[in-house]
Amino acid sequence: MRALPMLEERRHAFETCVYCPKLCRSACPVSNAEPRETLIPWGKMSSSYFAARGDVPLEESFAKPAWACTGCHACRDACDHKNDVAGSLLDARDAFVTNGLGPAASKRVLDRFSPEKSTGGALLVGCLYDRKLPDVSRAAASTAKKLFGDVSIERACCGLPLRLAGDKKRFEEHGKQFAGRDMIAVDPGCAMAVRDAGARVTMLVERAAERITSLREGPNDGGAREMRWHDPCQLGRGLGIYEAPRIVLTRVLGRAPLEFAMRRERAECSGGGGLLPLTMPDNSRTIAEKRVADSSGAEIVTACASSVLRFRSAGAQVTDIVTLIDAAL
């Protein structure tokens, strides 16, 4: 890896993809939205691999595919080798940014990131919830108080935007303040970020499922709502949490939620992850519109800030599961 030596430790992962006959090509939401060989997992990994080896010049055209990934892990789960494509492409982003390459939108994220000192809080709601979905943020704080009593809120960002935009060093430095702590997270992407930093994390939806008898049995909304559960990529394939939200929804709705045809380990991405709404907005929109069409008009309930925002931008009626939990306590 003479051109990008920082990717040497990922050599095996890259070569596993490069020499594979593209068996996971149908798993990627980005290349399904824009059918190009460059955008399938093989193409993205190949572009970074050949750039790292010096076989192609370090140019934007070869760097850009590294950002054509939502981090949904669908290709990993479809792979016989369980190859970590998402993690490898994040390291590729870091290598390209170090060499002055990367999408303009990604550079703006890095320029605008303002490091915050941790407030030492136990409840990590997430920046997207705080900024874009304040009603859910308030519901999360209310839920935590009802379940556990007074809970301090962590106001600092988890640092995930740094990792997604291509600054691994700043991400790791920022994350040191979370190491060794016990935290409850609302957004699964934030949970994975602080977990990688060494925090012990549980999800608020998990804690609600553990105290299921504290939730009033539904329906508490007149029974008129048809709700279809969407498994967020980071909650499901990332953290392996599938049962807790279904336990909670069955309790508060008075019946099991509707399901997408592709669910649990095979659930499909909302298009909201990996900075895709910023770096490839058209592809992100297409992915979200397909998921909304798959919902057949039912209200979508999920547990991920970026998914809520993506689905709403595509015209869907969307509820975050935290608001249902709060209403049932």
Regions found by a protein language model. Name each.
Residues 1-66:
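Ferredoxin-type iron-sulfur electron-transfer modules and their immediate structural context
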